Amino acid sequence: MRINTVLFDLDGTLINTNELIISSFLHTLNTYYPNQYKREDVLPFIGPSLHDTFSKIDENKVEEMITSYRKFNHDHHDELVEEYETVYETVRELKRQGYKVGIVTTKARQTVEMGLQLSKLDEFFDVVVTIDDVENVKPHPEPLQKALELLDAKPEEALMVGDNHHDIVGGQNAGTKTAAVSWTLKGRAYLEAYKPDFMLDKMSDLLPILSNMNRS
């Protein structure tokens, strides 16, 4: 079966938001729990939804903490977000070759659009599914299924690319092929444990992988 659709996670995959996310968590947690959290403590929070993360810390302050996180994240977005090399060129080439491309993310739409505009990727994506569009987040298959439906694509014709186990397991649950990115903050070995079909050392690795898959 030929692959004609590529779905991407956003944070840590298409754009480098690691410092923005870590700083947003530390700001929020230090506001409510001064000096209790260090950088390494918040790394496991990258990937799950904000609601899932903050509800495990204090169920009574979830909405307050989400509001605090999002305000800091919004205010410091452009200064802390960086590009990954070969991402722009690769996505542009996928579009040129006629692939359907979409984004599946657990972020809110407003900050998703900020990141896409900052990185100039906003012109390429046919579909963007955010946490605002679904009841369940990755690794539940719903967000991927929604993106595939909007793209008029079949799971067996799609590849999910991401930097977290939520992306890989989400793709597996939805029936797509999966590609993990080795630049994940959690480390290559962490993602290899979830058995993605492919491991990318740079985003441009996607192009020969897709070419080979569609030739066989």
UniProtKB/Swiss-Prot annotation:
Needed cofactors: Mg(2+)
EC number(s) given by UniProt: 3.6.1.1
GO BP terms, alphabetized: DNA repair
UniProt keyword Hydrolase, yes or no: yes
Gene Ontology MF terms: inorganic diphosphate phosphatase activity; magnesium ion binding; phosphoglycolate phosphatase activity
InterPro entries the UniProt entry points to: HAD-like_hydrolase_sf (IPR050155), HAD-like_sf (IPR036412), HAD-SF_hydro_IA (IPR006439), HAD-SF_hydro_IIIA (IPR006549), HAD_2 (IPR041492), HAD_sf (IPR023214), PGP-like_dom2 (IPR023198), Pyrophosphatase_Ppax (IPR023733)
Organism superkingdom: Bacteria
Matching Pfam families: HAD_2
UniProt keywords, alphabetically: Hydrolase, Magnesium
Entry's family note: Belongs to the HAD-like hydrolase superfamily. PpaX family.
Protein name: Pyrophosphatase PpaX
Gene source species: Bacillus cereus (strain B4264)
Record lineage: Bacteria, Bacillati, Bacillota, Bacilli, Bacillales
